[in-house]
Regions:
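SAM-dependent Rossmann-like transferase core, predominantly class I methyltransferases
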Residues: 51-131, 136-151, 162-164, 169-171
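N-terminal auxiliary segments of SAM/dcSAM-dependent transferases
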Residues: 1-71
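Short SAM/SAH-binding signature in class I
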Residues: 175-177
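Structured loop/turn residues at beta-strand edges in well-structured enzyme cores
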Residues: 18, 108, 158, 173
C-alpha cells in the first residue's frame, strides 16, 4: 500500500482528510508539520508496521478520542503545545480570544494578563509569545494541568508565572486583561 492509498483508507474509515494526514504522519514518525511530504511522496510504499500503527490511531480517533490526545500535541497560535488528558484540547476558535486580549494590551507599556483555567497554557503562552514585555499569570486549580502548562512554557522558552488557585482565591494584584 502506498501513501495515497493509506490516506484514502483513512477517509474510507471515516476520518476527515486533515485528521488522516496528521495521524499518518504521527504513525510514520514524521513531523506533523510535514504535510507537503505527503504530496511529494504519495506513491511511496508504506511499511506494514506503519500501516498497522496508522490504522490503530484511526480506530482511536473513530472512538472520538481527540487527535491532540492521540498525537500528544496541538498547534495553537503558531505554537506547538504538548497536550494530554490532564487538559482540554485547545480549540482553534480560542485564538480569537488571544487576538482580542492582544488588542486590549496595545498601547500599554507592560500589560498584565490573567489567564484563569489555563489548562495547557495555550492562551497565556500565545500572549507571551506575541508580547514579550507582558506580565502573564496563568492560574489553574489542577496541579496536573499546571505541570503540563509549565512544561509547555519551558519547551517554548517563554516566561509565564503559574499559580494553583481556585479561580481568584489565591490571585493577588491588578490586571489589565
Amino acid at each position: 500500500m502506498n501513501v495515497a492509498q493509506c490516506l484514502t483508507r483513512g477517509h474510507v474509515l471515516g476520518l476527515p482528510r486533515l485528521e488522516a494526514q496528521i495521524l499518518f504522519l504521527h504513525a510514520t514518525g514524521r513531523s506533523l508539520h510535514d504535510r507537503a511530504w505527503l504530496l511529494a511522496h504519495d506513491t511511496d510504499e508504506v511499511l506494514p508496521e506503519h500501516i498497522a500503527a496508522f490504522e490503530a490511531l484511526a480506530q482511536r480517533r473513530l472512538q472520538l478520542e481527540p487527535v491532540a490526545y492521540i498525537v500528544g500535541q496541538k498547534e495553537f497560535f503558531g505554537l506547538t503545545l504538548a497536550i494530554d488528558k490532564r487538559v482540554l484540547d485547545p480549540r482553534a476558535d480560542t485564538e480569537v480570544l488571544v487576538d482580542w486580549a492582544l488588542a486590549c494590551g496595545l498601547g500599554l507599556e507592560r500589560p498584565k494578563y490573567l489567564d484563569l483555567g489555563t489548562g495547557s497554557g495555550a492562551i497565556a503562552l500565545a500572549l507571551k509569545s506575541q508580547l514579550s514585555e507582558a506580565e502573564v499569570l496563568a492560574v489553574d486549580n489542577s496541579a496536573e494541568a499546571l505541570s503540563l502548562a509549565a512544561q509547555n512554557a519551558h519547551n517554548l522558552a517563554l516566561h509565564v508565572s503559574f499559580l494553583q488557585s481556585n479561580w481568584f482565591s489565591q490571585v493577588q494584584g491588578k490586571f489589565n486583561v
